[in-house]
Amino acid sequence: AVTGVQTCALPISYCDFNSHVWRGSGEIPEDDYLNALQTDLERSLPLVWGRTVQTVFIGGGTPSLFSPASIDRLLTLIRSRLRLVAGAEITMEANPGTFEAQRFRDFAAAGVNRLSIGVQSFSDRALEAIGRVHDAAQARAAVDLAASVFGTFNVDLMYALPGQSLADAQADLSEALQRGAPHLSCYHLTLEPGTPFAS
C-alpha cells in the first residue's frame, strides 16, 4: 500500500512529483488531508479486497512534516481497512531538515518501522547546488538517529549533481555505508520538464 503526503517545506528545483509547499498561516491542515486520504482509501477498497498487504510506504512530499499523531491516525486508518501481515514493513520518507529526535521516536511508536531519509549528499556544496533545506551535518545526524531508533532504514543519494565529481559521489556512498545504512537508493539527477533545473 502506498500513500502520499504531498506537502514540502520548500520547492525542490529538480522535483516533478505532485507536491505543494504549505504557504498558509498556522499549521498544516493535517486532519483535512487525512480525511481526504480516508475517503480515497475507502473508494479504492473494492480494488484490493482479499489481498494481504506486505508493506506500507508513506511517501512525499515530506510526510515527516506531519505530526506523529497524524501518522498514527493514518496507520490506524490503513490497519482498520486493509489486512496487513504480522510485522509488515511500514516505511516513511523523511527529510533531514525536518527531523527531531523525539519526532523520530514518536513515529516509531506510531508504527513506522523503517525510515527512508532523503539525504541526497553528505556534501554541503552539493546540497546547496540542488537547493536542499538541510546541510551535511543534519544529514549525518538524521542517519545516525535513524540507525538508533529504527530496525532498518534507507538512505537516498543522488549523483550527477552540479559540480559533483566521481570521487565526490563515491565519498557519499562510502559515508552512507560507514554510517551503517542497510539499504541505499541511488538516483541520477534527471532534468525533468517543467522544473527550474530544466530551464
Question: What kind of region is each of these model predictions?
Answer:
Residues A1-C8:
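Single conserved hydrophobic/aromatic residue that forms the stacking wall/gate
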Residues A9-S19:
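Local cysteine-cluster metal-coordination motifs and their immediate loop/turn environment
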Residues S19-L47, R51-S199:
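Conserved non-cysteine loop/helix-boundary elements of the Radical SAM core domain that shape
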